[in-house]
Amino acid sequence: MKRRELEKKLRKVRVTPQQDKYYTIGNLQWAIRMINLMGIKCVCDEECSAAEVALIITQFSALDLENSPIRGKEEVAIKNTLKVFWSLLAGYKPESTETALGYWEAFTYREREARADKEGEIKSIYPSLTQNTQNKKQTSNQTNTQSLPAITTQDGTPRFDPDLMKQLKIWSDATERNGVDLHAVNILGVITANLVQEEIKLLLNSTPKWRLDVQLIESKVREKENAHRTWKQHHPEAPKTDEIIGKGLSSAEQATLISVECRETFRQWVLQAAMEVAQAKHATPGPINIHQGPKEPYTDFINRLVAALEGMAAPETTKEYLLQHLSIDHANEDCQSILRPLGPNTPMEKKLEACRVVGSQKSKMQFLVAAMKEMGIQSPIPAVLPHTPEAYASQTSGPEDGRRCYGCGKTGHLKRNCKQQKCYHCGKPGHQARNCRSKNGKCSSAPYGQRSQPQNNFHQSNMSSVTPSAPPLILD
């Protein structure tokens, strides 16, 4: 089935009959990706058939997902998506998920009936064949349980053969953007199903970008290790702690341990520690997610960081390490330029004193003067600018500030503040044109705005009479 045709058919299938949500090609791709993580090869292409999808559903249903993070709602969603995909490939036209499940139940019922009839015929002909087959299955299961993750050679001895390339790539892609989050923990639970303790440690240490998350996981694992040692004193029959954490043993010895419970216990410790770290990052703003704002005082940033560290479930050594490094790494650029030369081991009092004046006008001007001195520029700019309005007014006012009145021509004030008002009509000081009482330069009893005759826009009093130079024209 072609991809475009598959997308059209998926958009017609409802997730539930009561809702208007429909399946998309993204749902199918997610289910296939999770199936591939479980070790089952599943490819969605144009040549995929309904029989292949039915085999994949059967293999996924046979997996033991008790200790896997893919269980509950995610497991049901994967199965339902694959069954809808199978029903479309089989030629059915389901309206919703329930209809597709009904088609699948009918198909499996027919398969069981046909298989039962065939097994009945085989038992009647070869009665001892079934018993031999069951014995072989039990023997193979025991061999696989004892040899995983080691490989059994031809002479029957187990041999450790590490192959972490696929797991390392998956883990690197899962932690590339957000580090150890909830999605990465689910991926970690899937890819560490058959790994020994040394391989799990190598997997965690393969992400140097998120070293802080890995250190938190290791600290929580050490807490569980100490708790198990204390518990072992009262329960001497428990497995050895060194066997659980793989201490003092080679990878081959870890792989050939008789007790598979040790590997599984260490794996559960790592998953629980990673889940606690991921939940702490997403539930409340933890110390890893606290950053200093561009204009936030350094003391306020340290107070928020210390409050977050106090609420974190971690040893005091881990909290002290985080406080020393995060107080520098998560500060803003201005504070980092001062704290980097001091180093993370500097006492907190010196850090606070160094960043006390960061962001103020004085510190900015000091940085400016220092930069200008390094460039060899001599400037009369003072090191500290005035901070009060009075001081600012005293420096920016006065005749030497360059301001000149275009009315009287004097410096020290502007035209709107000039006290020597001048009338534009008569040219005399002391009043404005709207209050002028003169008429053509002569005194008038009526105000300027109430005269009967309109006035010109220029001074007529200053104009003289003009005599024409040409002789007059005489008409006969």
Curated annotation (Swiss-Prot):
Belongs to the bovine lentivirus group gag polyprotein family. One of its GO terms (molecular function) is zinc ion binding. It comes from the Viruses. SMART domains: ZnF_C2HC. InterPro entries: Gag_p24_C, Primate_lentivir_Gag_pol-like, Retrov_capsid_C, Retrov_capsid_N, Znf_CCHC, Znf_CCHC_sf. Gene3D superfamilies: 1.10.1200.30, Human Immunodeficiency Virus Type 1 Capsid Protein (1.10.375.10), Zinc finger, CCHC-type (4.10.60.10). Disulfide bonds: none annotated. PROSITE patterns: ZF_CCHC (PS50158). GO terms for cellular component: host cell; viral nucleocapsid. The sequence shown is that of isolate R29-127. The keyword Metal-binding applies. This is Gag polyprotein. The record marks 126-127, 148-149, 367-368, 392-393 as: Cleavage.
